[in-house]
């Protein structure tokens, strides 16, 4: 199964739509959003209607928490975890948060195969103990190119996708 990891969308609807179209064409089965989607209306109008699989989300630092949770309840495939989430997909334990400090703590715990995070808008990967710590960058393209990551559970391969190169 292929899993897309995105973060820091910051209401950039055109980039989100392009990424979602690519995900559909490339059989992405699940999506993890590491925060800063921003406007709750983006969840209801763009993200949830245009992604067929499960969507796992956490808060960033610029969301309307109450309204975002309310919108998420309208979509059975959307699970909002609050500030930190964890799931297991194809035998891989994954945690996801927005802030790098919390992500490093989770990675150091040794409980996860992957910890995903956002906030810095910079793609990054490192290994702490046996945990791969990954920042997919910013889908909005703020301060760097618009990027997201894809993890393939069948091949154990993680790739950074640069949005402008996919079009």
Show which residues each predicted segment covers:
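Generic ordered-secondary-structure signal
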Residues: 1, 45-46, 62, 70-73, ...
């Amino acid at each position: 199964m292929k899993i897309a990891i995105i973060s820091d969308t910051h209401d950039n609807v055109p980039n989100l739509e392009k990424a979602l179209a690519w995900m559909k064409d490339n059989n992405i089965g699940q999506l993890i959003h590491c925060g800063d989607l921003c406007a709750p209306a983006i969840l209801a109008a763009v993200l949830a209607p245009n992604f067929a699989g499960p969507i796992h989300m956490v808060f960033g630092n610029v969301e309307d928490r109450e309204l975002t949770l309310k919108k998420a309840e309208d979509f059975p495939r959307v699970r909002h975890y609050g500030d930190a989430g964890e799931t297991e997909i194809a035998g891989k334990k994954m945690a996801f948060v927005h802030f790098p400090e919390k992500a490093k703590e989770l990675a150091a715990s040794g409980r996860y195969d992957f910890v995903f995070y956002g906030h810095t808008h910079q793609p990054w990967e490192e290994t702490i103990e046996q945990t791969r710590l990954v920042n997919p960058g910013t889908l909005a393209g703020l301060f760097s190119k618009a990027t997201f990551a894809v993890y393939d559970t069948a091949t154990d391969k993680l790739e950074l996708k640069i949005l402008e190169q996919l079009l």
